[in-house]
Structures are given as structure tokens and as C-alpha cells.
Amino acid sequence: IVIGAEEKFDPKIAASYKKTPSSFDRSIEPDYGETASLAVPDVYKASLENGLKIYGIENDEVPLVRFNLSIKGGQLLESMDKLGLANLTASLLEKGTANKTVTELEEAIQELGASINVYSGTENTTISATTLAKNYDKTLALVKEMLLEPRFDSNEFDLVKKATIARLRQQEASPNAVARNTYNELIYGKDNMRGKNNLGNTGSVSNITLEDVK
């Protein structure tokens, strides 16, 4: 590499290119075409005997079933000294059941060609699943097992805590994350739960115990 060996040029001089010829005048705005039609699917509603409300859309193009189960809760049920508890709980629900280790649970889900994810928000904790229609009952059985018979393994709990703290430290180095967290505090106030990071903070997450999750 020889410094200064490059050719000199004037950046103010713009190159000229021959324009591609057109069969019409591009300076004239074309007429609008027909308004596109949008077919909005019908949403059906139902209620179970236990009071659960169901909202659904039918689509027979592919043999798949996708469903979300929302449970009232999430960040708004936390206390200020336990920020991030809902997120830790949701993450730990994916880490095995009373009858299955993490690996066994993952294998059971994969054998069905399904995916099951649990995440928490401000007002709800949501279990989201996608599966083949023929495996719907088996997938739903796994969801039930994850919710009602969680493993709550201490080693997995420690790993989830460490991963969450690592994410929080990454956010501290991200201008977008810092801006988002600061914006929420300014909008809702420092004493309002909605102004807090859904993951909590490094101090609060470190103080959460497995008994808090249970």
C-alpha cells in the first residue's frame, strides 16, 4: 500500500450517464388503477366451560394450527424490588417439566414438528405454539405439562438469570435500548411499572430466587 499513490479527482464533478429511453412521459403522473380488494377473514368466538374465551380464524391452505394462550399477569404483577420476575418465570417454563428434562422436552416438541414459546409482557404472559393439525392434541398436552408441571430446576434457573443479566448489560451498550428505556421512564414516570424494563435490572434480577418464581 502506497499512501498518496491514488489518482487525484474532484468529488464535485458528477459523472454523466445516458438515460434509458422511455415509451412514455415519466413527468406525467399515471392514472390510478382499481382499488385493491382485501378479504378480511371472519373471526369466530367461543367460550369453554371453565370460562376461557377463544378467538380464532380458519385457514385451510396448509395443515397447521397456531395458537396463543394469554394469561393475565406479566410485569404489572411484579414489585419494584423483584423487577424481571415475570420474564424469568416465563423463560423457566421452557426449561423442562416434572417428567422431562430440558433435552427431553425439546426432543418431544421437535418430534411433533412443533414450536412452543413462552414470553411475558406488560400485562400478560403468553404461550405461543405452532404445530401440524394432526399433532394438535399432543402439542396441547405438552403445553399443559409445561404450565401445570414445571421442572423449576435450580441449575437452569441460574443459567436463565445469568443470560438475562448478560442481555441487560448488552442493552447498556446499545443506544437504542438506552433511549427506549429512558423514553418509557419519561412517559410513565420512575415509580410506574410501565416505565420499567421488562427484563428488570441487574440488581433486581440478581436478588430473585427460585422460591420467588415458584
Give the residues covered by each predicted segment.
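M16 family metallopeptidases and their MPP-like homologs
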Residues: 1-4, 55-57, 61-149, 165-169, ...
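Proteolytic maturation boundary segments
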Residues: 1-72
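Hydrophobic pocket-lining residues within nucleotide cofactor-binding pockets
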Residues: 12-15, 131, 208
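Short N-terminal helix-initiation segments at or just after the protein's N-terminus
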Residues: 16, 30-34, 162-177
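Histidine-acidic residue clusters that define the catalytic metal-binding segment
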Residues: 28-45, 185-214
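Hydrophobic/aromatic residues in well-formed alpha-helices
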Residues: 51, 105, 139, 157-160, ...
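Alpha-helix N-capping/helix-start residues
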Residues: 99, 154, 207-210
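Surface-exposed patches in mature extracellular/periplasmic domains of secreted proteins
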Residues: 117-119, 152-159
